Every structure is written in structure tokens, then in C-alpha cells.
């Protein structure tokens, strides 16, 4: 069909369609929810789409996304088209990095927060969106990495779980010439080594960096991890 030969559809399948224990006939589909926010109307449309595909329930993910557990493989083109037609007002297919970097709610909402973590994530997303053209293998590698292995916390409480992913940012305010400004540390390396799980350690010598430098350092680290 026309949609099956579409480059955007192929990119979406590569990043959002996941295997299940039922083999090739049944897939799971991940909806990438910007900032983890859906309106009531959007949520109803997601539920209707899941029901149309044969899923009687959906799962909420730790990444603030939604998983449709069961979608028959032949329905994937129709599922994608309905996403575009019925939920085109929200980027559930990860067209941009904006809104798809996991953060805490940040200082604009949290009473003990120090930095506006979502705003920092938007700065990082803007850089990443400019870095590679869409629909390339390299871009897909970066999408997968950012979707699951990057988190930002607006203070040392680490509400996003940033020490437990491969690239994490922990923010901390600093007094610079009498003005309070957001800084942060870049952490990386969480994983399993010789069967033993471990958290990330401080990168870049553990130094606190201002936001712009922090974003640049994070992009460079992601390029290394994604082998770009």
C-alpha cells in the first residue's frame, strides 16, 4: 500500500513498534507523549484507538509515554493513519525531540525545585533536532537513545531518576555575581557490568556547568553513545 512505502511510516515503525511474545502477528505500539501530557479529549481518542486495534487496556510507562500492548501487525498502517488524522495535534510519533526528553516537573511547578528542567530539555531538544536529517539510520539510533536513556532533574532530589540512565543531568543553582543561575552536572555510565547493576558517575570531571555548556556537553556525549 502507499502508506507502507512511506518513509515517515517506516521511521515510525522502527522506533515505535515493538515485539511481543505472540510473534510477528501481534505487536505493541509506543505512543511518545510530549512532556507526559495528554488532554482529556486526547486521552479519549487514545482509548478509542486502542479499542479499535483490539487492546482492552493501555499501559503508562516510566518514560511518561503510553503503550498499546496488542496491535495486530496488519492493522499497523491503519493505526498510523488514524494517529495522524485523529491525534495530529500532539506529536505521538516522535517527529521532534521536543517534549520527549524525560524530566521532573521543574522549578516552575515544584516548590523545592531549583531549575526549570523541561526548559533545559527543550534547549537540548532544539540542538538535537538540528543535528541530523530525519529518516536516517543515525537519527533513529539517536531517537532510541534519547527516548529511553536521557533524563533531567531540576534539583538533587533526582525525581526523574537521572543517575539511573546512561546520560543524566542533575541541576543545582549557583550564585554568580549576586545572581542565582541554574547550573548542572552531567552523569553517565549507568548499566550492568559483569552482571552487577550500577548507577552513573559524574562526567566532565564532576564540574558544574552553566546551561548552554551543559547542553553542548550532553550533545557530544550522545554522539559518542549513538556512534555518530
Regions found by a protein language model. Give the residues of each.
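Peripheral terminal and linker regions in Fe-S/redox and tRNA-modifying enzymes
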Residues: 1-228
Amino acid at each position: 500500500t502507499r502508506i507502507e512505502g512511506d518513509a515517515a511510516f517506516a521511521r515510525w515503525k522502527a522506533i515505535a513498534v515493538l515485539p511481543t511474545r505472540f510473534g510477528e502477528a501481534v505487536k505493541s505500539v509506543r505512543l511518545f507523549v510530549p512532556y507526559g501530557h495528554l488532554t482529556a479529549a486526547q486521552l479519549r481518542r487514545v482509548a478509542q484507538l486502542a479499542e479499535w486495534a483490539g487492546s482492552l487496556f493501555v499501559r503508562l510507562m516510566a518514560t511518561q509515554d503510553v503503550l498499546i500492548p496488542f496491535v495486530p501487525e496488519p492493522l499497523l498502517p491503519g493505526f498510523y493513519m488514524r494517529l495522524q488524522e485523529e491525534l495530529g495535534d500532539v506529536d505521538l510519533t516522535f517527529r521532534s525531540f521536543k517534549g520527549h526528553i524525560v524530566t521532573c516537573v521543574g522549578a516552575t511547578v515544584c516548590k523545592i525545585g531549583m531549575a526549570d528542567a523541561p526548559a533545559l530539555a527543550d534547549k537540548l531538544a532544539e540542538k538535537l533536532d538540528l543535528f541530523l536529517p530525519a529518516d536516517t539510520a543515525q537519527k533513529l539510533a539517536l531517537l532510541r537513545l534519547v527516548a529511553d536513556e536521557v533524563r533531567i532533574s531540576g534539583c538533587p532530589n533526582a525525581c526523574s531518576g537521572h543517575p539511573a540512565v546512561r546520560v543524566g543531568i542533575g541541576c543545582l543553582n549557583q550564585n554568580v555575581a549576586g545572581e542565582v543561575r541554574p547550573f548542572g552536572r552531567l552523569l553517565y555510565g549507568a548499566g550492568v557490568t559483569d552482571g552487577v547493576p550500577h548507577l552513573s558517575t559524574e562526567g566532565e570531571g564532576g564540574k558544574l556547568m552553566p546551561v548552554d555548556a551543559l547542553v553542548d556537553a550532553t550533545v557530544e556525549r550522545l554522539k559518542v553513545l549513538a556512534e555518530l
